[in-house]
């Protein structure tokens, strides 16, 4: 047995089953001379109470990346998306794509809306960078969406989380 079990979730159909499972885990852990952390151990109805686990937020049967996970991704990408970086947009895209692919690899089971939100933020930062190159201030919004459409960034090779998720979902449907 491992010295400690950091995080795990047990899903049951009824509250009685959940309580029985909790007691079984308590006994199993006690046999090893360990104990469950009281503040982190609970029986909850996942249909009514959202819970967070391993970077995801589970809410009403849906999976979302935790706000903390999205914030960390933005913090990782920001240094590459600075308006004063002096690199071509293609070079910037080349630097951020591996991070986006890795993040998608872990969060590919999250809701499409979460992917759309991150994609939009990345494109807004890239539009802002392009505005700066034209001697303009501000964020990449409004008319910039017409000037530099999403397809513009796709043609430059920007990895789209939403498109990757759509493809992954299609592949899963085809397999069944």
Language model features with spans:
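Non-catalytic terminal/accessory segments
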Residues: 1-176
């Amino acid at each position: 047995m491992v010295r400690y079990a950091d995080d795990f979730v047990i899903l049951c159909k009824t509250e009685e089953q959940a309580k029985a499972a909790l007691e079984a885990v308590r006994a199993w852990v006690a046999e090893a001379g360990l104990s469950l952390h009281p503040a982190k151990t609970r029986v909850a109805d996942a249909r009514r109470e959202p819970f967070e686990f391993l970077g995801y937020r589970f809410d009403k049967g849906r999976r979302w990346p935790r706000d903390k996970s999205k914030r960390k991704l933005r913090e990782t990408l920001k240094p590459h998306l600075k308006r004063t970086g002096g690199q071509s947009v293609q070079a910037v895209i080349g630097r951020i794509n591996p991070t986006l692919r890795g993040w998608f690899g872990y969060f590919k089971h999250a809701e499409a809306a979460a992917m759309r939100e991150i994609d939009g933020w990345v494109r807004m930062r890239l539009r802002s960078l392009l505005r700066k190159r034209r001697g303009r201030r501000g964020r990449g919004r409004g008319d910039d969406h017409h000037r530099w459409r999403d397809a513009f960034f796709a043609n430059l090779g920007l990895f789209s989380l939403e498109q990757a998720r759509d493809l992954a979902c299609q592949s899963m449907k085809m397999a069944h």
